[in-house]
């Protein structure tokens, strides 16, 4: 199967389930054909979110941890929980190098999905072990979670957090919707006493977006689509047929690690939530730092180059501001990246 001959009957059924919540009622993969069509399209779009998160983690100096086995051997492993077609686990393994991992474990409530994901991983990484994962197996190294929250009942969510507490590190991506993002923010609060928050936050304090009065705000970001999303006619046709704006790829995410020195220090840094809003001669944005969240503004005349850059920046919007009250007057560029 390719983008030219997609199974639209399967894609329409899957998208309808995702949009109307029926995906939470049990396995929705009916065949390997379903998974192949999904992996090429919706799964690949999720992969763009993973690309953005992984680039940010590289900018922050983070690498996956090694964990000790029962025999004392240090190993780096990935557990892609709720793997679906396996795009998340493959993206992580490819980014850090499959040679740096001893195993990629897969779990899904659908045996069909696990089989597809394992086959795809073995094809992509012939020398990487993809053994069957057992819930009672040795400690979890890197736990990878992708678009699972809105498919979990309260009981299943609680069970997942029990599993998460066994991990050495967690990379978790969800859609950039208000509901999914705030649900992930709440999980951050539940786990931050046991893990070091690597990203998206620049601090270890309580989430400012969960403070009273911030109920309408949510922590979301935008991944830059690859050039082929605009230049490949098959992607253009897919976006039109599926009713998806491929220019906008919103997501929320959480990166946690038990190591307190897992990434470069981020004290004093701020993060722009979402995108700045431009007006004539000035802009406004929602800022997050260790003191909480606040609406800040910047006048074009104070820093014309930065004013223009903030509209074009494709990487994480992480800066060290110089402020007069709620007005940004300039910045020391910290680890904002190009997103390429």
Q: Would you name each region that the model predicts?
A:
Residues 1-25:
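N-terminal auxiliary segments of SAM/dcSAM-dependent transferases
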Residues 110:
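Conserved SAM/SAH-binding beta-strand->alpha-helix loop
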Residues 141-155:
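A short SAM/SAH-binding and catalytic strip from SAM-dependent methyltransferases
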Residues 167-176:
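Conserved beta-strand signature within the Rossmann-like core of class I S-adenosyl-L-methionine
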Residues 26-60:
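Class I SAM-dependent methyltransferase Rossmann-like catalytic core
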Residues 236-340:
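C-terminal lobe and adjacent flexible extensions of AdoMet/dcAdoMet transferase-like proteins
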Residues 74-84:
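Conserved class I S-adenosyl-L-methionine
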Residues 85-99:
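Conserved SAM-binding loop of SAM-dependent methyltransferases across substrates and taxa
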């Amino acid at each position: 199967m390719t983008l030219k001959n997609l199974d639209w009957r399967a894609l329409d059924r899957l998208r309808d389930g995702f949009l109307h919540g029926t995906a939470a009622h049990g396995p929705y993969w009916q065949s390997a054909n379903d998974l192949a069509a999904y992996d090429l399209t919706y799964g690949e779009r999720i992969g763009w979110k993973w690309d953005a998160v992984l680039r940010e983690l590289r900018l922050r100096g983070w690498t996956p941890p090694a964990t000790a086995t029962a025999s004392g051997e240090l190993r780096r492993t990935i557990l892609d929980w709720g793997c679906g077609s396996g795009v998340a686990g493959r993206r992580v393994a490819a980014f850090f190098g499959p040679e740096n991992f001893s195993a990629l474990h897969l779990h899904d409530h659908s045996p069909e999905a696990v089989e597809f994901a394992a086959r795809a991983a073995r094809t992509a990484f012939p020398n990487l072990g993809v053994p069957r994962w057992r819930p009672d197996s040795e400690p979890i190294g890197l736990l990878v979670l992708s678009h699972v929250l809105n498919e979990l009942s309260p009981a299943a969510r609680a069970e997942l957090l029990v599993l998460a507490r066994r991990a050495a590190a967690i990379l978790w991506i969800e859609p950039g919707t208000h509901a999914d993002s705030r649900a992930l923010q709440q999980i951050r609060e539940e786990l931050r006493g046991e893990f070091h928050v690597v990203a998206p936050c620049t601090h270890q304090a309580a989430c400012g977006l969960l403070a009273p009065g911030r109920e309408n705000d949510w922590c979301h970001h935008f991944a830059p689509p690859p050039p082929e999303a605009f230049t490949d006619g098959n992607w253009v046709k897919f976006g039109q047929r599926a009713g998806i704006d491929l220019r906008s790829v919103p997501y929320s995410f959480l990166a946690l690690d038990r190591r307190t020195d897992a990434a470069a220090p981020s004290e004093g840094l701020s993060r722009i939530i979402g995108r700045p809003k431009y007006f004539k001669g000035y802009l406004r944005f929602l800022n997050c730092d260790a003191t909480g969240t606040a609406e800040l503004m910047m006048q074009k005349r104070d820093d014309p180059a930065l004013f223009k850059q903030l509209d074009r920046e494709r990487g994480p919007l992480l800066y060290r501001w110089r402020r007069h009250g709620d007005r940004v007057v300039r910045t020391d560029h910290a680890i904002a990246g190009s997103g390429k």
